[in-house]
Amino acid sequence: MALSATEKSVIVKEYQVKEGDTGSPEVQVALLTANINKLQDHFQANKHDHHSRRGLIRMVNQRRKLLDYLKGKDTQRYVDLIQKLGLRR
């Protein structure tokens, strides 16, 4: 269910702010979004997997916190990230 190393490296390269960046809010949010999307596909086939649903809720909350942090720190980066990821806000 987790992302493979190649999927992670592609996402990191796409969203990194500078070379070697793996911890910026943009990268973290992009990785969480990919994991969330993968889990949503899992729940289409496994509706009663409540243990994984708890992990999904934790990921969504963590993404929300990171987005709130980014919005307070740099609004333009926040808006660009939301548009690039296709999130609703």
Swiss-Prot record:
InterPro entries: Ribosomal_uS15 (IPR000589), Ribosomal_uS15_bac-type (IPR005290), uS15_NS1_RNA-bd_sf (IPR009068). GO terms for cellular component: cytosolic small ribosomal subunit. GO terms for molecular function: rRNA binding; structural constituent of ribosome. Belongs to the universal ribosomal protein uS15 family. Part of the 30S ribosomal subunit. Forms a bridge to the 50S subunit in the 70S ribosome, contacting the 23S rRNA. This is Small ribosomal subunit protein uS15. HAMAP family: Ribosomal_uS15_B. It comes from Hahella chejuensis (strain KCTC 2396). SUPFAM superfamilies: S15/NS1 RNA-binding domain. One of its GO terms (biological process) is translation. The keyword 4Fe-4S does not apply. PROSITE patterns: RIBOSOMAL_S15. The keyword Cytoplasm does not apply. CDD domains: Ribosomal_S15p_S13e (cd00353). Keywords: Ribonucleoprotein, Ribosomal protein, RNA-binding, rRNA-binding. One of the primary rRNA binding proteins, it binds directly to 16S rRNA where it helps nucleate assembly of the platform of the 30S subunit by binding and bridging several RNA helices of the 16S rRNA.
